[in-house]
Amino acid sequence: MILRSLSCRFLTIALCDAAEPWQLGFQDAATPMMQGIIDLHHDIFFFLILILVFVLWMLVRALWHFNEQTNPIPQRIVHGTTIEIIWTIFPSVILLFIAIPSFALLYSMDGVLVDPAITIKAIGHQWYWTYEYSDYNSSDEQSLTFDSYTIPEDDPELGQSRLLEVDNRVVVPAKTHLRMIVTPADVLHSWAVPSLGVKCDAVPGRLNLTSILVQREGVYYGQCSEICGTNHAFMPIVVEAVTLKDYADWVSNQLILQTN
């Protein structure tokens, strides 16, 4: 099979970004969007550590200095104007520092390319995905279309991830602007690939768009992230990013196979 031969060729040099056992951090970023999400997480985590240390210091100090032994007669404090101003302004400033980059990233995630190089349509079914490449057909021809099913647990090949590998991967060119159109054929689904920073819901009756720029060659694993029925856990997503030349060869071979 053409897709499997391409997969074997690039498997030795390409990174495989998938979930790992006992993983605590993010997967390696493969798009500017995911890199922005990771950077924002690290920046916010820095503020969280500062707040945690300050609150713990206040609690320990209060327990140490204001107990029955050191302060047998407690003071009755109704209010303090200075401290109230401080604990109102200081958290507001922290939230402002967090909100500015958060909104900038949020608006960049909502941006849709006006003229993408490639458009791919992902259609969610119970329980598999269908992909359409409609840029390579004329008006009277069928789009390049294929279904993507999970590899059964009892039939994996050497090196394949359990419940994450599929029979037909989504092949895309690296360093090329892509537009993903996501929609379902039945119920709610969600097309999500963590390394790409993409999670696009498939809502019945709607076409949702998202833009992707894969910056490096590799194999990226995801799953349906919206509960969609009994076999929801068996709807993996595999995106393989290759060079533009190999992508063109793959498209040509797929078109030949489809016409035959």
From Swiss-Prot:
Where does the UniProt annotation locate this protein? Mitochondrion inner membrane
Q: What class of enzyme is it?
A: translocase
Q: In its keyword annotation, does this UniProt entry include Membrane?
A: yes
- EC numbers listed for it are 7.1.1.9
Topological domains on the Mitochondrial intermembrane side lie at 1-43, 106-260
Q: Where does Cu cation A1 bind?
A: H189, C224, C228, M235
Q: Which Gene3D superfamilies match?
A: 1.10.287.90, Cupredoxins - blue copper proteins
Give TM regions.
Answer: 44-64, 85-105
Cofactor note as given: Binds a dinuclear copper A center per subunit.
Write down the chemical reaction(s) this protein catalyses.
4 Fe(II)-[cytochrome c] + O2 + 8 H(+)(in) = 4 Fe(III)-[cytochrome c] + 2 H2O + 4 H(+)(out)
Q: Which GO terms describe its molecular function?
A: copper ion binding; cytochrome-c oxidase activity
* Encoding gene, per UniProt annotation: COX2
Recorded protein name is Cytochrome c oxidase subunit 2
**Member of which family?**
Belongs to the cytochrome c oxidase subunit 2 family.
What cellular component terms from Gene Ontology apply here?
Answer: mitochondrial inner membrane
Q: Which UniProt keywords apply?
A: Copper, Electron transport, Magnesium, Membrane, Metal-binding, Mitochondrion, Mitochondrion inner membrane, Respiratory chain, Translocase, Transmembrane, Transmembrane helix, Transport
Q: How does it assemble?
A: Component of the cytochrome c oxidase (complex IV, CIV), a multisubunit enzyme composed of a catalytic core of 3 subunits and several supernumerary subunits. The complex exists as a monomer or a dimer and forms supercomplexes (SCs) in the inner mitochondrial membrane with ubiquinol-cytochrome c oxidoreductase (cytochrome b-c1 complex, complex III, CIII).
Where is it mainly found? mitochondrion
Membrane topology, from the record: Multi-pass membrane protein
